[in-house]
Amino acid sequence: MNFHSTKPLSYDSSDNEIYNPFLVSTNEEGRVSPTIDKQQQPVLKRAKSIVSSNSLSAFFTDSKSKQQQQQQQRDRKRNKDRRNRPGRLRRSHSTNSNDQFIMNTGSFKLPDQDEFQFTMNNNSDNGFSSSTSSSDLESVPDLTDDNIDELTPETTPIKPVGNFYFNTLFDNEENTDGYYYKLNSQIKIRNELQQQQQQQQQQRLTSSSPSIFEIPEIVYKIISYVDEQNTILPQESTPIRRNPLSYKHALLIHGDKKSAQSALQKTTNQQSQQNQQPSSVISSSPLYNCLLVNKLFYKITSEIISTKFYSHNEQQLKKFIENKSHQQQNSSSPIIIQPKTFILHKLFQTKQIIFDQLIEFINFDQLSWFELYMCPKISLDKPQSQTFMKIFQSCSNNLTKLIITGSKTIDDEFLMKLGQFKCGDNLQILDLRACELITDFGIYQLSLYCRNLTFINFGRKPISNGNGNGGGNGGSGRYITDNSMIKLINNNRKLSTIGLAGCHITDKCVWEIANKLPNISRLSLNNCPKLTNSGINQIFTLTNTPNSNYFKCLSVLELRFNHQLTDLTSIIKFKRRQKFQFNIILLLELCESLMLKYRQQEFELDKLISLKIFQDISHWVNDYNDNDGDLSYNEIKHLINNNNNNNSSNNISTRGF
């Protein structure tokens, strides 16, 4: 066998110092030493042993490596289904020999060790003995790199040893070995994954849950509130008090000059505001902004807008008809709106042709409020057109409010058809003011079908008597009398508002109203020439009795232009009775002449009441014959004298003591 000899080391290896040929240090004696201090030395590599393949060392090394390979194969089979713990070093449990311990842990660095420390056998002395044989080099572990070109037979820099100690997720676990540690770690990882999945699901649910502005029912309520709060329909509002006819009239109503002037100024301002209010309100409606939010808002807002159709401008109405007709030509399906409210307000010049074109795009099945306010040229009962059939036959079950004022075509036949199509079954508000062709016959026919009316108005415009204040006895009001009104009152006991201005009713109708309608709150009897002074006084005198139930809820009474009324004392007492007994402030509407009579008679009544109060007080003070327990003047004088005598006698007796 051929052996490759090596040169002996140039220093004693028992000092356990590392030789670095590239650095030189000087001792105290001045000689050069190839050794350096451990704290200043760089990391060096240990020389790799070069062993011949024919040597005994190679033989033992090969056999030893084969045994290690076999042992590794057994370990792989044993740990095939097991997973090694990452980042932890397993210590060998075998402590039979120091060599095995050196084999398992000699190549690792502990935190409290130096850069490298040779492991000593038990059989060796205090240090490594220098030897020229290859067996000494075989005991040194191989710590060189795989790059053989950089190796030399002599010593080379040592490869730095890495620190294999680091923290893991389960450093706080007491059981860090074996099957239980693996099971606990798997359970913890599984729990963490489940928690992450739950959090992700919750995030998905929260992100996928719709907003309240994406729920159609809530959006519908929101837009409905916006519509109710901001949409002002073009209609005549009920005034709190009618406008004064003149400055003298305002002075009689309010009592002082400042109040009269402010009342006249308010009337002029209200008239100007009523003329400007509809256009400004309609153009600034917030519903048009709701159309621009999103598709859902647009759909619901357009549905709510289509439930109310109203117009007060003839030009806008014509544009609407043109747009609808153009859309109808471009689309295959008919474009029809279905409103619940239909109002045409003060369209004095609108003709029947425009109205017929308009109703072609409207379905009246859900109609509950139909109003034609001062549209005199529109007819609803024209024989050639089926206007009445299209409107009122389809909405007979839903119609609750019918207002047609100032029409020159509405007559008794129209009211008869309303009853025949059962439009009066649910009708509650009926306003037919200034419809000159309606007579007792039509009202009587309508009263046979209407049972739920709460508001009626058949008022007529008074004819001027030459003074400009009305009060004439002519006009169409003579066609409405007690014959129809008493029948209507008897069949509708829920009436609370009645307007009979200009009608030729008598005291009998007023008596039926007081006797049959306990809920009456507003009564308009302006310019009723058949009313008499004696009848009105008797009715209101009976209401002033203690046990009377007549007109208990009456809060508005209009008696303008009834110049035949001369005695208003019963009405004055009734007004005071409403205030003190029922806490109702009665609003009494009178014309200028009647208001003057009212103030004069009220002043005379106050004088009479004050005189009676003074007489009662004087009678109570000076009455001698009434045995009511009060002492007379002589008795009081006698008691005073007796009192004085007793006091003087007491003073004399005290002086004697």
Curated annotation (Swiss-Prot):
<keyword id="KW-0131">Cell cycle</keyword>
<keyword id="KW-0539">Nucleus</keyword>
<feature type="region of interest" description="Disordered">
    <location>
        <begin position="262"/>
        <end position="282"/>
    </location>
</feature>
<dbReference type="GO" id="GO:0005737">
    <property type="term" value="C:cytoplasm"/>
</dbReference>
<keyword id="KW-0498">Mitosis</keyword>
<dbReference type="InterPro" id="IPR006553">
    <property type="entry name" value="Leu-rich_rpt_Cys-con_subtyp"/>
</dbReference>
<protein>
    <recommendedName>
        <fullName>Antagonist of mitotic exit network protein 1</fullName>
    </recommendedName>
</protein>
<feature type="compositionally biased region" description="Polar residues">
    <location>
        <begin position="94"/>
        <end position="107"/>
    </location>
</feature>
<keyword id="KW-0963">Cytoplasm</keyword>
<feature type="compositionally biased region" description="Basic residues">
    <location>
        <begin position="75"/>
        <end position="93"/>
    </location>
</feature>
<dbReference type="GO" id="GO:0005634">
    <property type="term" value="C:nucleus"/>
</dbReference>
<feature type="compositionally biased region" description="Low complexity">
    <location>
        <begin position="270"/>
        <end position="282"/>
    </location>
</feature>
<comment type="similarity">
    <text>Belongs to the AMN1 family.</text>
</comment>
<feature type="compositionally biased region" description="Low complexity">
    <location>
        <begin position="121"/>
        <end position="135"/>
    </location>
</feature>
<dbReference type="GO" id="GO:0051301">
    <property type="term" value="P:cell division"/>
</dbReference>
<feature type="region of interest" description="Disordered">
    <location>
        <begin position="57"/>
        <end position="140"/>
    </location>
</feature>
<comment type="function">
    <text>Negative regulator of the mitotic exit network (MEN), required for multiple cell cycle checkpoints. Required for daughter cell separation and chromosome stability. Involved in copper sensitivity.</text>
</comment>
<keyword id="KW-0132">Cell division</keyword>
<dbReference type="InterPro" id="IPR032675">
    <property type="entry name" value="LRR_dom_sf"/>
</dbReference>
